[in-house]
């Protein structure tokens, strides 16, 4: 059997504390037993299920809602003082309670009680029940306290493990971050080096292209100049060939003239004089040939020969010719 004891103050005797006990078998809706005492006297009464249904009909309320209001009024420690009020008439043993709603109040329930002949027994049962309830609550409190201590230890253990996990996690994150920074810096260094290599390669390529362009321009300019140089060289070689041929012819003729003027015998003879005269007579015929050779040499381009060689050659020929022209038989004999 379940029971509930609460402390109330009656409207008729507010200075006296009364104790109200409500006990029931299954549910409050199936009926309950109510006991009221002031510590000296005791009153008790039984409320059946039919009476509860009759009260709900009189209140024009559903039974379940009415039982809920009874629970709040009788089992919740009389509720707030300004919501539920209790009153009891010792002469008629009539107990009733009301509910206040702002300025309106209505009677929630009323029961007829009977006075107990041996109130001490009722009071003793109330005291025993209270002590048992206190002991039970104390045991529950101890059990709950132990459970709380165990949970606190478990919580501390879990908190310690959690802190260790957090520390390990932070250390792992720090380590991973450091490794990530190292890898990132290495990648950045490699990227910078590759970028620098690309820039250097591009600069070298530009330099090579510029050098190739300059080389191509120089080669084109050299190719343009080579034909002119080759032509001038060919002309100079032809002039040198012609002049060398003329010079050799002139030298050979001078040698012949000089050899013709050599005298081997010391004593003069008529034959020698005659031969000399014939030679002198034929000498003017050779002069035109020398003049023709000089004209040919002068008509040819002599830009390739040095001026000094030309002058020496011409002076040698003139001297030989003048010597031949000015020489006479008498002079030759005088010299001999």
From Swiss-Prot:
Outcome after substituting residue 82 to E: In SSMED; impaired ability to repair DNA double-strand breaks
Disulfide bond residue pairs: none
Modification sites for Phosphoserine: 53, 193, 232, 237, 256, 260, 303-304, 315, 320, 327-328
Sequence segments annotated as region (Interaction with LIG4): 180-213
GO molecular function: DNA binding; enzyme binding; FHA domain binding; identical protein binding
Outcome after substituting residue 323 to A: In XRCC4-Ala mutant; abolished phosphorylation by PRKDC; does not affect ability to bridge DNA. Does not affect phosphorylation by CK2
Effect of residue 304 to D: In XRCC4-Asp mutant; phospho-mimetic mutant; abolished ability to bridge DNA
Keyword ATP-binding: no
Tissue/organ expression: Widely expressed.
PANTHER family: DNA REPAIR PROTEIN XRCC4
Illness association: Short stature, microcephaly, and endocrine dysfunction: A disease characterized by short stature and microcephaly apparent at birth, progressive postnatal growth failure, and endocrine dysfunction. In affected adults endocrine features include hypergonadotropic hypogonadism, multinodular goiter, and diabetes mellitus. Variable features observed in some patients are progressive ataxia, and lymphopenia or borderline leukopenia.
Protein name as catalogued: DNA repair protein XRCC4
Classification of source organism: Eukaryota, Metazoa, Chordata, Craniata, Vertebrata
Gene name of the record: XRCC4
């Amino acid at each position: 059997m379940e029971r509930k004891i609460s402390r109330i103050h009656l409207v008729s005797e507010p200075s006296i504390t009364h104790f109200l006990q409500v006990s029931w078998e299954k549910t409050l809706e199936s009926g309950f037993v109510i006991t009221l005492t002031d510590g000296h006297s005791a009153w008790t009464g039984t409320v059946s299920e039919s009476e509860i249904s009759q009260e709900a009909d009189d209140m024009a309320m559903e039974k379940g809602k009415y039982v809920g209001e009874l629970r709040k009024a009788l089992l919740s420690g009389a509720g707030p003082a300004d919501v539920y009020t209790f009153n009891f008439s010792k002469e008629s043993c009539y107990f009733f309670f009301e509910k206040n709603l702002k300025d309106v109040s209505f009677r929630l329930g009323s029961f007829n009680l009977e006075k107990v002949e041996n109130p001490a027994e009722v009071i003793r049962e109330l005291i025993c029940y209270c002590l048992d309830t206190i002991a039970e609550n104390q045991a529950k409190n101890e059990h709950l306290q132990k459970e709380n201590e165990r949970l606190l230890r478990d919580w501390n253990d879990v908190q310690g493990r959690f802190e260790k996990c957090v520390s390990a996690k932070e250390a792992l994150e720090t380590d991973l971050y450091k490794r990530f920074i190292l890898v990132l810096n290495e990648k950045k260094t490699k990227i910078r080096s590759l970028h620098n290599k690309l820039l250097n390669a591009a600069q070298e390529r530009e330099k090579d292209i510029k050098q190739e362009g300059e080389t191509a321009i120089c080669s084109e300019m050299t190719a343009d100049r080579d034909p002119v140089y080759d032509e001038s060289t060919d002309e100079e070689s032809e002039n040198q060939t012609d002049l060398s041929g003329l010079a050799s012819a002139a030298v050979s003729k001078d040698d012949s003239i000089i050899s013709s003027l050599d005298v081997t015998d010391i004593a003069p003879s008529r034959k020698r004089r005659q031969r000399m005269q014939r030679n002198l007579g034929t000498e003017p015929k050779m002069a035109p040939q020398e003049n023709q050779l000089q004209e040919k040499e002068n008509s040819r381009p002599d830009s390739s020969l040095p001026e000094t060689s030309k002058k020496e050659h011409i002076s040698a020929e003139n001297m030989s010719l003048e010597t031949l022209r000015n020489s006479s038989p008498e002079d030759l004999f005088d010299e001999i």
